């Protein structure tokens, strides 16, 4: 099932457009649900259908970020083909870093290219959405902590990361974590085609089957030291082909069973 958050564009701006939760049905309609997406963690289909409010066409809604994570835990080198591209040895354990909640962005929205940066890169990734409080779980137990999967673009100010000697500042600019458009609860995370395009040109084209560490293994490793909250994201690493985006570019990340995350890079004035 594809869950999403959205606003009704037909609601008056003066009254304020409330962020609603819902899912995409088989006919491409957006079905509003009572409560929040995360309320439906482990819910069966009957529980979902009992909480329907009304339906909308996609043309009548504005898609929002599907979650508001307290943190985004990101994984460094996690694709075998990316390691080969960089002439790197396969890591023995995941390399982790964190993007702040202020980096969260949404589908079909602007990414601001910081005026103090000289290079901004795309990194298309599969993201795991945590469904419940998670601490010190095994990989087998981690499967029961996953709400679903979405797309994230781990946008990076590359000149910052190279110049600083560490990643925090270059990964943490406001809006540098577009997420969405949907959370898919039923997919094989290790059998997904992942493609990133810039201005229609394919830059990344790989498969999540190339992952070194599975989402479940990553959750287990991360949860050894930090509590993962419902709605937190784990970005599972990017495939080969990472590169620069120029100002005024359109970047699209597609994962076959989720959809396409599309954003526009605009230079800060």
Please describe what each predicted stretch is.
Residues 1-94, 187, 202, 254:
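N-terminal non-catalytic cap/leader segment that marks the start of a structured domain
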Residues 56, 62, 66, 82, ...:
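Catalytic-pocket segment enriched in acidic/His residues
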Residues 90-107, 122, 252-257:
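Structural signature of FAD isoalloxazine-binding scaffolds in flavoprotein oxidoreductases
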Residues 107-127:
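A structural-propensity feature for long, helix-poor, extended segments
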Residues 135-149:
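N-terminal accessory regions of nucleic-acid-interacting proteins
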């Amino acid at each position: 099932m594809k869950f999403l958050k959205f606003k009704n564009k037909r609601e008056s701006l003066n009254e304020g457009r409330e962020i609603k939760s819902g899912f995409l049905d088989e006919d491409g309609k957006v079905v509003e649900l009572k409560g929040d997406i995360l309320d439906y963690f482990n819910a069966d289909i009957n529980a979902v259908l009992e909480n329907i409010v009304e339906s909308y066409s996609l043309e009548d809604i504005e898609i929002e970020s599907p979650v508001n994570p307290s943190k985004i835990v990101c994984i460094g080198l996690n694709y075998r083909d990316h390691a080969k591209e960089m002439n790197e040895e396969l890591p023995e354990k995941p390399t982790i870093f964190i993007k702040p909640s202020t980096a969260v962005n949404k589908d079909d929205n602007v990414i601001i290219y910081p005026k103090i940066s000289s290079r901004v890169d795309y990194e298309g990734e599969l993201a795991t959405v945590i469904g419940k409080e998670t601490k010190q779980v095994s990989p087998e137990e981690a499967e029961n902590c996953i709400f679903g999967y979405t797309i994230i673009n781990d946008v990076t100010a590359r000149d910052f990361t190279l110049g600083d000697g560490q990643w925090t500042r270059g990964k943490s600019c406001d809006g540098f974590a577009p997420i969405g458009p949907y959370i898919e609860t039923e997919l094989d995370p290790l059998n997904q085609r992942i493609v990133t395009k810039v201005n229609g040109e394919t830059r990344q084209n790989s498969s999540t089957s190339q992952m070194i560490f599975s989402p479940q293994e990553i959750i287990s490793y991360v949860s050894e030291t930090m509590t993962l909250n419902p709605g937190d994201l784990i970005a599972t690493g990017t495939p080969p082909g990472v590169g620069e985006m120029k100002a005024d570019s359109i970047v699209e990340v597609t994962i076959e069973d989720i959809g396409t995350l599309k954003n526009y890079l605009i230079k800060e004035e």
